[in-house]
């Protein structure tokens, strides 16, 4: 029988999937009208009249980032805490720092906030760090089944694409890539978590 600590650790991938799925739904619904890399008065007007939902949505994104870091740490443990796995966790932590500081600024929104800059920080810096961390952990983990490996690499490659789209201030590119990432990523967390367990 597993210890309570073992059961808690085994839940990390599922918790990360739930948190990231909830954040993605928030982005597609309550956050979407306020989110734009070409931020304008219409976006600001939406945020001002939906401030509670806006703040709750970005709080979900902070929880998603923290759960992703927990998943990276859990995954690194499964990969044997090799040097590459340790580097991956450090890079993932840098991504969380970039994400949380950007999202905290979005939560504390006021009319003069440069929302586009906060979105770029999250979209470019955090996503690049997460994608590097994920790629390093893919390499550090031996024996992936072909389907899970292809699926996982697709997630991290799309993550790099999202960083490029955000750097280019492409709302359409960012929206399409974000949707593709989360459609793949949330179930991959569960499937990879089961295999790694």
Model-derived segments and spans:
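Hydrophobic, aromatic-enriched alpha-helical segments typical of multi-pass transmembrane helices
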Residues: 1-197
């Amino acid at each position: 029988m597993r210890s309570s600590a073992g059961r808690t650790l085994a839940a990390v991938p599922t918790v990360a999937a739930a948190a990231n799925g909830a954040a993605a739904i928030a982005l597609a619904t309550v956050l979407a009208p306020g989110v734009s890399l070409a931020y304008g008065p219409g976006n600001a007007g939406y945020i001002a009249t939906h401030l509670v939902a806006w703040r709750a949505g970005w709080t979900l994104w902070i929880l998603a980032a923290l759960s992703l870091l927990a998943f990276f740490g859990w995954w690194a443990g499964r990969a044997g805490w090799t040097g590459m796995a340790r580097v991956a966790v450090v890079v993932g932590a840098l991504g969380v720092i970039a994400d949380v500081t950007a999202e905290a600024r979005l939560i504390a929104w006021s009319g003069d906030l440069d929302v586009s800059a906060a979105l770029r920080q999250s979209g470019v810096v955090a996503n690049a760090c997460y994608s590097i961390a994920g790629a390093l952990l893919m390499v550090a983990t031996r024996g992936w089944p072909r389907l899970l490996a292809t699926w996982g690499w697709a997630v991290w490659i799309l993550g790099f694409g999202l960083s490029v789209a955000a750097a280019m201030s492409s709302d359409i590119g960012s929206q399409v890539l974000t949707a593709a990432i989360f459609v793949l990523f949330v179930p991959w967390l569960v499937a990879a978590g089961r295999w790694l367990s």
